[in-house]
Protein backbone atom coordinates (compact mmCIF):
# COMPACT_ATOMS: atom_id res chain seq x y z
CA UNK A 1 0.00 0.00 0.00
CA UNK A 2 2.85 2.39 0.88
CA UNK A 3 4.48 1.66 -2.45
CA UNK A 4 1.25 2.51 -4.27
CA UNK A 5 0.96 5.79 -2.38
CA UNK A 6 4.56 6.64 -3.19
CA UNK A 7 4.06 5.92 -6.88
CA UNK A 8 1.04 8.21 -6.96
CA UNK A 9 2.98 10.98 -5.15
CA UNK A 10 5.94 10.64 -7.48
CA UNK A 11 3.78 10.72 -10.57
CA UNK A 12 1.94 13.81 -9.34
CA UNK A 13 5.17 15.63 -8.54
CA UNK A 14 6.60 14.75 -11.94
CA UNK A 15 3.52 16.05 -13.73
CA UNK A 16 3.63 19.26 -11.64
CA UNK A 17 7.25 19.78 -12.63
CA UNK A 18 6.52 19.23 -16.31
CA UNK A 19 3.64 21.68 -16.19
CA UNK A 20 5.82 24.23 -14.37
CA UNK A 21 8.59 23.78 -16.94
CA UNK A 22 6.37 24.70 -19.87
CA UNK A 23 4.29 27.37 -18.15
CA UNK A 24 4.47 30.61 -20.05
CA UNK A 25 6.31 28.98 -22.97
CA UNK A 26 5.39 28.64 -26.65
CA UNK A 27 3.24 25.61 -25.88
CA UNK A 28 0.54 27.88 -24.43
CA UNK A 29 0.18 30.03 -27.53
CA UNK A 30 -2.81 27.96 -28.60
CA UNK A 31 -4.72 29.33 -25.60
CA UNK A 32 -3.87 32.98 -26.30
CA UNK A 33 -7.41 33.73 -27.34
CA UNK A 34 -8.92 32.54 -24.07
CA UNK A 35 -9.93 34.91 -21.29
CA UNK A 36 -7.12 36.04 -19.00
CA UNK A 37 -6.76 34.14 -15.75
CA UNK A 38 -7.68 36.01 -12.55
CA UNK A 39 -4.79 37.68 -10.79
CA UNK A 40 -3.82 35.46 -7.85
CA UNK A 41 -2.28 38.45 -6.02
CA UNK A 42 -5.45 40.60 -6.14
CA UNK A 43 -9.08 39.92 -5.30
CA UNK A 44 -12.04 40.56 -7.58
CA UNK A 45 -12.05 44.22 -6.47
CA UNK A 46 -8.38 44.72 -7.27
CA UNK A 47 -7.30 44.78 -3.64
CA UNK A 48 -4.02 43.02 -2.79
CA UNK A 49 -4.19 39.57 -1.24
CA UNK A 50 -1.69 36.89 -0.32
CA UNK A 51 -0.40 34.84 -3.22
CA UNK A 52 2.04 31.92 -3.26
CA UNK A 53 3.90 30.07 -6.02
CA UNK A 54 2.82 26.59 -7.07
CA UNK A 55 3.88 23.61 -5.02
CA UNK A 56 6.69 21.83 -6.88
CA UNK A 57 9.36 19.19 -6.56
CA UNK A 58 12.25 21.61 -6.26
CA UNK A 59 14.78 18.84 -6.90
CA UNK A 60 13.41 17.80 -10.28
CA UNK A 61 16.01 18.05 -13.03
CA UNK A 62 18.62 19.67 -10.81
CA UNK A 63 22.22 18.50 -10.43
CA UNK A 64 23.16 16.65 -7.27
CA UNK A 65 26.72 16.61 -6.00
CA UNK A 66 27.60 13.24 -4.51
CA UNK A 67 30.69 12.13 -2.63
CA UNK A 68 30.70 8.61 -4.12
CA UNK A 69 29.44 6.96 -7.31
CA UNK A 70 30.22 3.45 -8.49
CA UNK A 71 31.80 2.68 -11.85
CA UNK A 72 35.14 4.50 -11.68
CA UNK A 73 36.81 2.06 -12.10
CA UNK A 74 34.20 -0.53 -13.13
CA UNK A 75 33.25 -2.69 -10.15
CA UNK A 76 31.04 -5.63 -9.28
CA UNK A 77 27.96 -5.18 -7.12
CA UNK A 78 25.45 -7.74 -5.98
CA UNK A 79 21.73 -7.33 -5.38
CA UNK A 80 20.32 -9.37 -2.51
CA UNK A 81 16.87 -10.92 -2.63
CA UNK A 82 15.08 -13.34 -0.34
CA UNK A 83 13.05 -16.43 -1.07
CA UNK A 84 11.64 -17.57 2.20
CA UNK A 85 14.63 -17.96 4.48
CA UNK A 86 16.99 -18.34 1.54
CA UNK A 87 19.11 -15.32 0.60
CA UNK A 88 20.04 -14.90 -3.08
CA UNK A 89 22.61 -12.62 -4.70
CA UNK A 90 22.54 -11.44 -8.29
CA UNK A 91 25.79 -9.74 -9.31
CA UNK A 92 26.25 -7.07 -11.98
CA UNK A 93 28.86 -4.62 -13.22
CA UNK A 94 28.75 -0.89 -12.54
CA UNK A 95 30.64 0.93 -15.28
CA UNK A 96 30.48 4.72 -15.50
CA UNK A 97 31.73 4.59 -19.09
CA UNK A 98 28.81 2.45 -20.26
CA UNK A 99 25.46 4.30 -20.20
CA UNK A 100 23.62 1.01 -19.83
CA UNK A 101 25.65 0.01 -16.78
CA UNK A 102 26.19 3.43 -15.21
CA UNK A 103 24.41 4.77 -12.11
CA UNK A 104 25.13 8.54 -12.20
CA UNK A 105 23.77 11.22 -9.83
CA UNK A 106 21.46 12.49 -12.59
CA UNK A 107 19.24 9.46 -11.90
CA UNK A 108 18.37 10.97 -8.51
CA UNK A 109 16.30 13.83 -9.94
CA UNK A 110 15.16 12.58 -13.35
CA UNK A 111 11.56 11.64 -14.11
CA UNK A 112 10.78 8.76 -11.77
CA UNK A 113 9.07 5.95 -13.68
CA UNK A 114 8.13 3.01 -11.43
CA UNK A 115 8.17 0.72 -14.46
CA UNK A 116 11.67 1.75 -15.49
CA UNK A 117 13.60 2.69 -12.37
CA UNK A 118 16.92 4.47 -12.73
CA UNK A 119 19.13 4.43 -9.67
CA UNK A 120 22.14 6.32 -8.48
CA UNK A 121 24.52 4.02 -6.66
CA UNK A 122 27.52 4.56 -4.39
CA UNK A 123 30.71 2.56 -4.21
CA UNK A 124 30.51 -0.72 -2.28
CA UNK A 125 30.73 -0.98 1.48
CA UNK A 126 31.44 2.59 2.51
CA UNK A 127 30.65 1.82 6.10
CA UNK A 128 30.74 4.05 9.20
CA UNK A 129 32.74 6.19 9.97
CA UNK A 130 32.84 6.96 6.22
CA UNK A 131 29.83 8.97 5.04
CA UNK A 132 28.28 9.24 1.61
CA UNK A 133 26.65 12.63 0.96
CA UNK A 134 24.14 13.95 -1.57
CA UNK A 135 24.09 17.75 -1.87
CA UNK A 136 21.33 19.54 -3.78
CA UNK A 137 21.28 23.29 -4.48
CA UNK A 138 17.76 24.67 -4.94
CA UNK A 139 19.00 27.92 -6.53
CA UNK A 140 17.11 30.20 -4.12
CA UNK A 141 15.25 30.07 -0.86
CA UNK A 142 12.37 27.60 -0.75
CA UNK A 143 9.87 26.81 1.96
CA UNK A 144 10.34 23.06 2.14
CA UNK A 145 7.38 20.85 3.03
CA UNK A 146 9.07 17.45 2.72
CA UNK A 147 12.27 15.67 1.71
CA UNK A 148 11.87 12.11 0.45
CA UNK A 149 14.13 9.37 -0.88
CA UNK A 150 13.11 6.12 -2.57
CA UNK A 151 15.76 3.41 -2.38
CA UNK A 152 16.87 0.70 -4.78
CA UNK A 153 18.97 -0.76 -1.95
CA UNK A 154 17.98 -1.39 1.66
CA UNK A 155 17.45 1.81 3.57
CA UNK A 156 20.41 3.03 5.66
CA UNK A 157 20.69 2.11 9.29
CA UNK A 158 21.66 5.71 10.04
CA UNK A 159 21.29 8.86 7.95
CA UNK A 160 20.87 12.59 8.46
CA UNK A 161 19.22 15.38 6.50
CA UNK A 162 20.73 18.87 6.69
CA UNK A 163 19.68 22.22 5.30
CA UNK A 164 21.50 25.43 4.44
CA UNK A 165 19.95 28.88 4.34
CA UNK A 166 23.01 30.62 2.93
CA UNK A 167 23.74 28.66 -0.23
CA UNK A 168 25.92 26.02 1.38
CA UNK A 169 28.14 28.19 3.56
CA UNK A 170 26.71 26.80 6.79
CA UNK A 171 24.57 23.76 7.55
CA UNK A 172 22.07 22.92 10.29
CA UNK A 173 20.43 19.54 10.99
CA UNK A 174 16.94 18.96 9.63
CA UNK A 175 16.30 15.34 10.72
CA UNK A 176 18.16 12.25 11.94
CA UNK A 177 17.28 8.60 11.35
CA UNK A 178 19.03 5.85 13.31
CA UNK A 179 18.48 2.80 15.48
CA UNK A 180 21.24 4.20 17.70
CA UNK A 181 20.45 7.94 17.99
CA UNK A 182 22.63 8.61 21.01
CA UNK A 183 25.65 6.74 19.68
CA UNK A 184 25.49 8.06 16.12
CA UNK A 185 24.27 11.65 16.57
CA UNK A 186 24.34 12.29 20.31
CA UNK A 187 20.60 12.89 20.24
CA UNK A 188 17.87 11.38 22.40
CA UNK A 189 15.59 8.89 20.74
CA UNK A 190 12.25 10.41 19.68
CA UNK A 191 12.54 13.46 21.95
CA UNK A 192 9.22 15.27 22.45
CA UNK A 193 8.74 18.39 20.32
CA UNK A 194 7.55 21.49 22.18
CA UNK A 195 7.21 25.16 21.30
CA UNK A 196 10.58 25.69 22.93
CA UNK A 197 12.44 23.28 20.61
CA UNK A 198 10.24 23.05 17.53
CA UNK A 199 13.02 24.56 15.43
CA UNK A 200 15.43 21.73 16.29
CA UNK A 201 16.12 18.43 14.52
CA UNK A 202 15.00 15.22 16.20
CA UNK A 203 16.25 11.67 15.84
CA UNK A 204 13.92 8.73 15.17
CA UNK A 205 14.25 5.04 14.32
CA UNK A 206 11.26 5.08 11.99
CA UNK A 207 12.00 4.15 8.36
CA UNK A 208 15.27 2.48 9.41
CA UNK A 209 14.23 -1.14 8.91
CA UNK A 210 16.43 -3.06 6.50
CA UNK A 211 13.40 -4.43 4.74
CA UNK A 212 12.13 -4.04 2.11
CA UNK A 213 15.48 -4.77 0.45
CA UNK A 214 14.44 -2.51 -2.46
CA UNK A 215 11.80 0.18 -2.93
CA UNK A 216 11.87 1.43 0.65
CA UNK A 217 10.92 5.06 1.33
CA UNK A 218 12.12 7.68 3.78
CA UNK A 219 9.96 10.81 3.84
CA UNK A 220 10.62 13.70 6.22
CA UNK A 221 7.81 16.23 6.78
CA UNK A 222 9.24 19.51 8.02
CA UNK A 223 6.13 20.59 9.97
CA UNK A 224 4.83 17.23 11.18
CA UNK A 225 4.47 17.31 14.95
CA UNK A 226 5.54 20.96 15.29
CA UNK A 227 3.16 22.68 17.78
CA UNK A 228 2.94 25.99 15.88
CA UNK A 229 2.28 24.40 12.49
CA UNK A 230 -1.44 25.22 12.73
CA UNK A 231 -0.56 28.93 13.09
CA UNK A 232 2.28 29.00 10.57
CA UNK A 233 1.51 32.56 9.38
CA UNK A 234 2.22 33.90 12.85
CA UNK A 235 5.24 31.75 13.63
CA UNK A 236 8.51 33.33 12.46
CA UNK A 237 10.33 30.42 14.09
CA UNK A 238 8.71 27.83 11.83
CA UNK A 239 8.88 30.11 8.80
CA UNK A 240 12.63 30.16 9.34
CA UNK A 241 12.69 26.42 10.09
CA UNK A 242 11.24 25.37 6.72
CA UNK A 243 13.43 27.80 4.73
CA UNK A 244 16.34 26.29 2.79
CA UNK A 245 18.55 27.07 -0.19
CA UNK A 246 20.33 23.69 -0.17
CA UNK A 247 19.59 20.18 1.08
CA UNK A 248 22.20 17.62 2.06
CA UNK A 249 21.63 13.93 2.83
CA UNK A 250 24.40 12.12 4.69
CA UNK A 251 24.32 8.30 4.76
CA UNK A 252 26.27 7.24 7.85
CA UNK A 253 25.80 3.48 8.39
CA UNK A 254 24.78 0.60 6.10
CA UNK A 255 22.36 -2.13 7.11
CA UNK A 256 24.04 -5.55 6.83
CA UNK A 257 23.18 -9.17 7.53
CA UNK A 258 26.31 -9.51 9.63
CA UNK A 259 28.12 -11.63 7.05
CA UNK A 260 30.60 -9.03 5.89
CA UNK A 261 33.37 -10.61 7.97
CA UNK A 262 32.76 -14.27 7.04
CA UNK A 263 34.81 -16.38 4.62
CA UNK A 264 33.04 -15.08 1.53
CA UNK A 265 33.12 -11.57 2.92
CA UNK A 266 34.15 -10.05 -0.43
CA UNK A 267 30.93 -11.22 -2.02
CA UNK A 268 28.99 -10.03 1.00
CA UNK A 269 30.62 -6.60 1.01
CA UNK A 270 29.83 -6.18 -2.68
CA UNK A 271 26.19 -6.48 -1.63
CA UNK A 272 26.22 -3.45 0.65
CA UNK A 273 25.95 0.01 -0.90
CA UNK A 274 23.56 2.95 -1.07
CA UNK A 275 21.28 3.22 -4.09
CA UNK A 276 18.50 5.78 -4.56
CA UNK A 277 16.01 5.93 -7.41
CA UNK A 278 14.40 9.26 -6.58
CA UNK A 279 15.19 12.33 -4.46
CA UNK A 280 12.37 14.81 -4.00
CA UNK A 281 12.20 18.14 -2.18
CA UNK A 282 8.59 19.27 -2.08
CA UNK A 283 7.90 22.91 -1.41
CA UNK A 284 7.29 26.37 -2.75
CA UNK A 285 9.57 29.12 -3.92
CA UNK A 286 9.83 31.41 -0.85
CA UNK A 287 8.18 34.72 -1.70
CA UNK A 288 6.64 35.64 1.66
CA UNK A 289 3.13 35.76 0.22
CA UNK A 290 3.94 38.52 -2.26
CA UNK A 291 4.38 36.56 -5.52
CA UNK A 292 2.53 33.84 -7.40
CA UNK A 293 5.53 32.54 -9.33
CA UNK A 294 9.29 32.50 -9.61
CA UNK A 295 11.10 33.47 -12.81
CA UNK A 296 14.63 33.71 -14.16
CA UNK A 297 16.24 37.13 -14.02
CA UNK A 298 18.86 38.55 -16.38
CA UNK A 299 21.58 36.60 -14.60
CA UNK A 300 19.55 33.39 -15.00
CA UNK A 301 18.99 33.31 -11.24
CA UNK A 302 15.67 32.13 -9.88
CA UNK A 303 13.80 35.01 -8.22
CA UNK A 304 10.26 35.81 -7.15
CA UNK A 305 8.07 37.80 -9.53
CA UNK A 306 7.24 40.25 -6.75
CA UNK A 307 3.93 42.05 -6.35
CA UNK A 308 2.42 44.28 -3.65
CA UNK A 309 5.21 46.86 -4.18
CA UNK A 310 7.84 44.49 -2.81
CA UNK A 311 11.30 43.63 -4.13
CA UNK A 312 14.20 41.25 -3.54
CA UNK A 313 14.81 37.59 -4.45
CA UNK A 314 12.22 36.57 -1.84
CA UNK A 315 10.08 39.76 -1.97
CA UNK A 316 11.63 40.36 1.42
CA UNK A 317 11.77 44.15 1.31
CA UNK A 318 9.77 47.09 0.01
CA UNK A 319 10.69 48.46 -3.37
CA UNK A 320 12.13 52.00 -3.49
CA UNK A 321 9.82 54.84 -2.42
CA UNK A 322 7.36 52.42 -0.78
CA UNK A 323 8.50 52.87 2.83
CA UNK A 324 5.41 54.38 4.46
CA UNK A 325 5.11 51.30 6.66
CA UNK A 326 7.53 48.47 7.48
CA UNK A 327 7.78 45.39 5.30
CA UNK A 328 5.75 42.43 6.51
CA UNK A 329 5.04 38.94 5.26
CA UNK A 330 1.58 38.49 3.74
CA UNK A 331 -0.91 36.38 5.65
CA UNK A 332 -4.27 34.84 4.85
CA UNK A 333 -5.93 37.84 6.51
CA UNK A 334 -3.70 40.71 5.41
CA UNK A 335 -1.70 41.20 2.22
CA UNK A 336 0.56 43.65 4.08
CA UNK A 337 1.50 45.32 0.82
CA UNK A 338 4.16 48.03 0.88
CA UNK A 339 2.74 51.55 0.68
CA UNK A 340 4.24 54.46 -1.24
CA UNK A 341 5.39 57.49 0.71
CA UNK A 342 3.11 60.51 0.46
CA UNK A 343 5.38 63.19 -1.00
CA UNK A 344 2.78 65.03 -3.08
CA UNK A 345 4.78 64.30 -6.27
CA UNK A 346 7.67 66.46 -5.07
CA UNK A 347 10.22 63.77 -4.07
CA UNK A 348 11.65 60.60 -5.56
CA UNK A 349 13.16 59.14 -2.41
CA UNK A 350 12.00 58.58 1.14
CA UNK A 351 12.93 56.64 4.25
CA UNK A 352 11.08 54.89 7.04
CA UNK A 353 11.00 56.25 10.60
CA UNK A 354 9.74 53.84 13.25
CA UNK A 355 9.12 56.56 15.85
CA UNK A 356 6.83 58.49 13.51
CA UNK A 357 5.14 55.25 12.54
CA UNK A 358 4.33 54.48 16.18
CA UNK A 359 3.15 58.05 16.85
CA UNK A 360 0.75 57.79 13.89
CA UNK A 361 -0.91 54.72 15.37
CA UNK A 362 1.11 52.45 13.07
CA UNK A 363 -0.34 54.00 9.94
CA UNK A 364 2.43 56.08 8.36
CA UNK A 365 6.18 56.30 8.90
CA UNK A 366 7.50 57.60 5.59
CA UNK A 367 9.75 60.67 5.51
CA UNK A 368 10.35 62.30 2.12
CA UNK A 369 13.93 63.12 1.14
CA UNK A 370 15.16 66.01 -1.02
CA UNK A 371 11.81 67.70 -1.63
CA UNK A 372 11.74 69.49 -4.97
CA UNK A 373 9.75 72.39 -6.45
CA UNK A 374 10.52 74.63 -3.43
CA UNK A 375 8.60 72.42 -1.00
CA UNK A 376 9.61 71.15 2.44
CA UNK A 377 8.33 69.01 5.28
CA UNK A 378 7.96 65.31 5.98
CA UNK A 379 5.48 64.96 3.11
CA UNK A 380 6.77 67.91 1.02
CA UNK A 381 3.45 69.41 2.06
CA UNK A 382 4.39 73.04 2.65
CA UNK A 383 6.59 75.64 0.99
CA UNK A 384 10.17 76.13 2.04
CA UNK A 385 11.46 79.41 3.51
CA UNK A 386 11.15 82.23 1.02
CA UNK A 387 8.10 80.73 -0.73
CA UNK A 388 4.33 80.63 -0.13
CA UNK A 389 1.41 78.52 -1.35
CA UNK A 390 -0.36 79.43 -4.55
CA UNK A 391 -3.87 78.47 -3.45
CA UNK A 392 -4.99 78.42 -7.06
CA UNK A 393 -2.97 75.24 -7.63
CA UNK A 394 -3.10 71.89 -5.81
CA UNK A 395 -0.19 71.02 -3.53
CA UNK A 396 0.86 68.34 -6.03
CA UNK A 397 1.43 70.94 -8.76
CA UNK A 398 5.03 71.69 -9.72
CA UNK A 399 4.37 75.41 -9.20
CA UNK A 400 2.33 75.15 -6.01
CA UNK A 401 4.90 77.34 -4.24
CA UNK A 402 5.61 80.92 -5.32
CA UNK A 403 8.61 83.01 -4.34
CA UNK A 404 7.94 85.57 -1.59
CA UNK A 405 10.13 88.19 -3.32
CA UNK A 406 10.34 90.21 -0.10
CA UNK A 407 11.99 93.59 -0.68
CA UNK A 408 15.63 93.43 0.49
CA UNK A 409 15.36 96.79 2.32
CA UNK A 410 11.69 97.14 3.20
CA UNK A 411 11.19 93.62 4.60
CA UNK A 412 12.36 92.47 8.02
CA UNK A 413 13.10 88.96 6.70
CA UNK A 414 12.85 86.63 3.73
CA UNK A 415 10.07 84.43 5.12
CA UNK A 416 6.52 85.36 4.24
CA UNK A 417 3.12 84.12 5.38
CA UNK A 418 2.61 80.61 3.94
CA UNK A 419 -1.00 81.37 3.03
CA UNK A 420 -1.11 85.04 1.98
CA UNK A 421 2.49 85.61 0.92
CA UNK A 422 2.68 88.74 3.11
CA UNK A 423 6.27 89.62 3.95
CA UNK A 424 7.17 90.98 7.42
CA UNK A 425 7.56 94.72 6.87
CA UNK A 426 9.67 97.18 8.80
CA UNK A 427 8.02 100.11 10.61
CA UNK A 428 6.35 102.47 8.17
CA UNK A 429 6.62 100.03 5.24
CA UNK A 430 3.64 98.36 3.58
CA UNK A 431 2.73 96.19 0.60
CA UNK A 432 2.72 92.38 0.19
CA UNK A 433 6.43 92.46 -0.60
CA UNK A 434 7.14 95.51 1.63
CA UNK A 435 8.03 97.64 -1.36
CA UNK A 436 6.50 101.03 -0.45
CA UNK A 437 6.03 103.43 2.44
CA UNK A 438 2.77 103.43 4.35
CA UNK A 439 0.47 106.43 4.48
CA UNK A 440 1.98 109.17 6.63
CA UNK A 441 5.53 107.95 5.97
CA UNK A 442 8.15 109.02 3.49
CA UNK A 443 11.19 107.26 2.10
CA UNK A 444 14.56 107.81 3.71
CA UNK A 445 18.04 106.80 2.70
CA UNK A 446 18.48 104.57 5.73
CA UNK A 447 18.42 100.80 5.07
CA UNK A 448 17.52 100.30 8.74
CA UNK A 449 14.49 102.62 8.68
CA UNK A 450 13.66 103.03 5.00
CA UNK A 451 10.38 104.81 5.77
CA UNK A 452 10.06 107.56 8.38
CA UNK A 453 7.09 109.53 9.60
CA UNK A 454 6.33 112.76 7.79
CA UNK A 455 6.65 115.49 10.49
CA UNK A 456 3.73 117.84 11.01
CA UNK A 457 4.98 121.42 10.57
CA UNK A 458 4.28 123.72 13.56
CA UNK A 459 2.01 126.69 12.90
CA UNK A 460 5.02 129.01 13.15
CA UNK A 461 8.69 128.47 12.67
CA UNK A 462 10.82 127.62 15.60
CA UNK A 463 12.27 131.11 15.66
CA UNK A 464 8.86 132.82 15.76
CA UNK A 465 7.91 130.98 18.95
CA UNK A 466 10.56 132.88 20.84
CA UNK A 467 10.56 136.62 21.14
CA UNK A 468 13.67 138.05 19.57
CA UNK A 469 15.91 139.69 22.19
CA UNK A 470 16.73 143.33 21.79
CA UNK A 471 20.50 142.75 21.78
CA UNK A 472 20.67 140.10 18.97
CA UNK A 473 22.92 142.37 16.97
CA UNK A 474 25.44 142.43 19.77
CA UNK A 475 24.95 138.70 20.54
CA UNK A 476 25.45 137.29 17.04
CA UNK A 477 25.36 138.23 13.46
CA UNK A 478 22.75 136.33 11.44
CA UNK A 479 23.83 135.18 8.05
CA UNK A 480 22.51 137.15 5.13
CA UNK A 481 22.64 136.26 1.48
CA UNK A 482 24.61 133.37 0.04
CA UNK A 483 27.52 131.79 1.86
CA UNK A 484 30.48 130.16 0.20
CA UNK A 485 32.09 126.91 1.30
CA UNK A 486 35.85 126.70 1.22
CA UNK A 487 38.60 124.52 2.64
CA UNK A 488 39.39 127.02 5.41
CA UNK A 489 35.86 126.92 6.79
CA UNK A 490 35.80 123.11 6.44
CA UNK A 491 39.01 122.72 8.43
CA UNK A 492 37.96 125.02 11.29
CA UNK A 493 34.96 122.89 12.26
CA UNK A 494 34.87 119.55 14.09
CA UNK A 495 32.16 118.02 11.96
CA UNK A 496 30.43 118.53 8.61
CA UNK A 497 27.16 116.74 7.85
CA UNK A 498 24.18 116.93 5.53
CA UNK A 499 20.95 116.89 7.56
CA UNK A 500 17.22 116.78 6.93
CA UNK A 501 15.14 118.59 9.60
CA UNK A 502 12.18 116.37 10.52
CA UNK A 503 10.57 118.07 13.51
CA UNK A 504 11.29 120.51 16.37
CA UNK A 505 10.38 120.36 20.06
CA UNK A 506 10.99 122.89 22.87
CA UNK A 507 12.93 121.45 25.79
CA UNK A 508 13.56 124.09 28.45
CA UNK A 509 16.37 126.41 27.33
CA UNK A 510 16.95 124.25 24.27
CA UNK A 511 15.31 123.34 21.02
CA UNK A 512 15.53 119.64 20.12
CA UNK A 513 15.40 118.99 16.40
CA UNK A 514 14.89 115.47 15.13
CA UNK A 515 17.10 115.24 12.07
CA UNK A 516 18.08 112.55 9.63
CA UNK A 517 21.82 112.63 8.96
CA UNK A 518 22.05 111.83 5.28
CA UNK A 519 25.82 112.10 4.74
CA UNK A 520 28.85 112.58 7.01
CA UNK A 521 31.76 114.50 5.45
CA UNK A 522 33.71 115.09 8.63
CA UNK A 523 33.37 113.87 12.20
CA UNK A 524 35.18 114.43 15.43
CA UNK A 525 35.60 112.23 18.47
CA UNK A 526 31.83 111.75 18.74
CA UNK A 527 31.81 109.44 15.71
CA UNK A 528 28.68 110.76 14.05
CA UNK A 529 26.75 108.12 12.11
CA UNK A 530 24.08 108.33 9.48
CA UNK A 531 20.43 107.95 10.44
CA UNK A 532 18.04 109.68 12.81
CA UNK A 533 19.61 111.75 15.61
CA UNK A 534 18.86 114.76 17.80
CA UNK A 535 20.24 118.23 17.02
CA UNK A 536 20.36 120.58 20.02
CA UNK A 537 20.39 124.39 19.67
CA UNK A 538 19.96 126.92 22.49
CA UNK A 539 16.69 128.87 22.45
CA UNK A 540 18.49 132.24 22.35
CA UNK A 541 20.44 131.17 19.21
CA UNK A 542 17.20 130.18 17.50
CA UNK A 543 15.55 133.45 18.58
CA UNK A 544 18.40 135.44 17.03
CA UNK A 545 18.36 133.23 13.94
CA UNK A 546 21.91 132.10 14.65
CA UNK A 547 21.51 129.71 12.96
CA UNK A 548 18.34 130.09 10.93
CA UNK A 549 16.58 126.70 10.54
CA UNK A 550 13.21 125.66 9.14
CA UNK A 551 11.58 122.20 9.45
CA UNK A 552 11.42 119.84 6.44
CA UNK A 553 14.45 121.49 4.87
CA UNK A 554 17.87 120.03 4.12
CA UNK A 555 21.02 121.79 5.33
CA UNK A 556 24.78 121.55 5.40
CA UNK A 557 25.83 121.84 9.03
CA UNK A 558 29.41 122.60 10.09
CA UNK A 559 29.96 122.85 13.82
CA UNK A 560 32.13 122.12 16.82
CA UNK A 561 31.78 119.21 19.22
CA UNK A 562 29.92 120.11 22.43
CA UNK A 563 28.07 118.10 25.02
CA UNK A 564 24.36 117.85 24.36
CA UNK A 565 21.79 118.16 27.17
CA UNK A 566 20.97 114.45 27.20
CA UNK A 567 24.42 113.14 26.20
CA UNK A 568 23.11 112.13 22.77
CA UNK A 569 23.02 113.81 19.43
CA UNK A 570 24.97 116.83 18.18
CA UNK A 571 25.00 120.50 19.18
CA UNK A 572 24.94 123.63 17.01
CA UNK A 573 25.31 127.22 18.18
CA UNK A 574 25.78 130.75 16.90
CA UNK A 575 29.26 129.86 15.66
CA UNK A 576 27.98 126.91 13.61
CA UNK A 577 27.60 127.27 9.89
CA UNK A 578 24.14 126.19 8.68
CA UNK A 579 23.51 126.58 4.96
CA UNK A 580 20.56 125.28 2.94
CA UNK A 581 21.79 122.26 1.04
CA UNK A 582 22.80 122.26 -2.61
CA UNK A 583 23.51 118.98 -4.43
CA UNK A 584 26.55 120.56 -6.12
CA UNK A 585 28.30 120.71 -2.74
CA UNK A 586 28.57 116.96 -2.35
CA UNK A 587 31.46 116.65 -4.81
CA UNK A 588 33.31 119.65 -3.32
CA UNK A 589 32.97 118.31 0.21
CA UNK A 590 34.33 114.91 -0.84
CA UNK A 591 37.39 116.66 -2.26
CA UNK A 592 37.85 118.54 1.03
CA UNK A 593 37.56 115.20 2.83
CA UNK A 594 40.22 113.56 0.65
CA UNK A 595 42.60 116.53 0.93
CA UNK A 596 42.32 116.50 4.70
CA UNK A 597 43.24 112.80 4.81
CA UNK A 598 46.34 113.41 2.68
CA UNK A 599 47.52 116.22 4.94
CA UNK A 600 47.25 114.06 8.07
Curated annotation (Swiss-Prot):
Disulphide bridges, residue numbers: 119-152, 285-294, 287-304, 306-315, 318-338, 341-350, 343-368, 371-380, 383-401, 404-416, 406-423, 425-434, 437-451, 472-544
Broad class of where this protein is predominantly found: secreted
GO BP annotations listed: animal organ morphogenesis; apoptotic process; Cdc42 protein signal transduction; chemorepulsion of axon; dendrite development; motor neuron axon guidance; positive regulation of axon extension; positive regulation of cell motility
Pfam family, one: EGF_LMN_ATRN
Domain Laminin EGF-like span(s) in chain numbering: 285-340, 341-403, 404-453
Keywords: Apoptosis, Cytoplasm, Disulfide bond, Glycoprotein, Laminin EGF-like domain, Repeat, Secreted, Signal
CC annotations in GO: basement membrane; cytoplasm; extracellular region
Disulfide bond is among the record's keywords: yes
Signal peptide start-end: 1-24
Domain Laminin N-terminal: 47-284
Subcellular compartments: Secreted; Cytoplasm
Protein name: Netrin-1
Amino acid sequence: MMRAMWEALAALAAVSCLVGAVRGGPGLSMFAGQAAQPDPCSDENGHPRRCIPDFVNAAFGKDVRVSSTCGRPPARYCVVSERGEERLRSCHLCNASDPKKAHPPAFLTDLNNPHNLTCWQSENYLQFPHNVTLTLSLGKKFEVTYVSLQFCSPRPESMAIYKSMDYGRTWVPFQFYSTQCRKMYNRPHRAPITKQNEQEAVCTDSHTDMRPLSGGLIAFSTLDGRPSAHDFDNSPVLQDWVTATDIRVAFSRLHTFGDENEDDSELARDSYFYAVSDLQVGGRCKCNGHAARCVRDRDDSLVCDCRHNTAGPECDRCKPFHYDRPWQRATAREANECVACNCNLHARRCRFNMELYKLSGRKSGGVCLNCRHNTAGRHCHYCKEGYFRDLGKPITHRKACKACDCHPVGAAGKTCNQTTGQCPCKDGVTGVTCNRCAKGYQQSRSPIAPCIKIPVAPPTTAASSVEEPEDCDSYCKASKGKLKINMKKYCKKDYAVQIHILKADKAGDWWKFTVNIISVYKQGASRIRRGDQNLWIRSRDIACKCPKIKPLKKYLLLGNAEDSPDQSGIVADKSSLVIQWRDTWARRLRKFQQREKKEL
